[in-house]
Amino acid sequence: MKLLAIISASLALAGFTTATPPPQTFSIKAKGNPKVPSARFDASRSNIFLNYGDSGAVCEVKPGCPKPKDAVFYLKDSILYLYTGSSNPVQKVFLDRSGFGQGKIGYLTGDGQLPSRWEVQGWTIDGAGNLKFKGKGLIACPTSDPKIKSWTVWADLGIATPGGNKGCLPFTAHTMKTKPVACKYT
């Protein structure tokens, strides 16, 4: 009994701490609409895209290993985060369902104050592995530049042309477990 107390006290004095395991990370793919290609989610320039290409993210990968092609996310307390690891500032996904934002989805770096109309809490993954915001799905809108083949991601609020975008289509945002590779997104 005394030996156990001595060991416990020694560990406490030595600053022994247990490492926090990384959160369950996942990538997201667009599925369920034949007009929206089975596309990966990318994060760049504070926006969420489908098939954006090189996002410019700086990732912590082992030498000889490629950086992830998809953005890496995790969910905590119904807030959707980009996985940045412990050495980068937090990056959390927001949604603006106001008349001004019309379902705009993006992400912010840091833990600063959010504008009052932006929401971060309300994300869930259903039993089939599909990501939703307060029970609603997502839509994709093709970019207006014909040279760019990516799509912007919006919340499905029943608005056919959010932000003035045309050709927007609903899809299922399906999550898939992935390795926790820390990246800082631009």
Curated annotation (Swiss-Prot):
Record-level GO BP terms: sporulation resulting in formation of a cellular spore
Transmembrane segments: none
Induction per the UniProt record: Expression is down-regulated in presence of human keratinocytes.
Keywords of this entry: Allergen, Cell wall, Secreted, Signal, Sporulation
Residues spanning the signal sequence: 1-19
Compartments (UniProt record): Secreted; Secreted, Cell wall
GO cellular component terms given for this protein: extracellular region
Function: Cell wall protein involved in development of asexual structures such as phialide and conidium development, and thus required for spore formation. Plays a role as a general stress protectant produced by the fungus in competition with antagonistic bacteria.
Protein family per UniProt: Belongs to the phiA family.
Name this protein carries in UniProt: Cell wall protein phiA
UniProt source species: Arthroderma benhamiae (strain ATCC MYA-4681 / CBS 112371) (Trichophyton mentagrophytes)
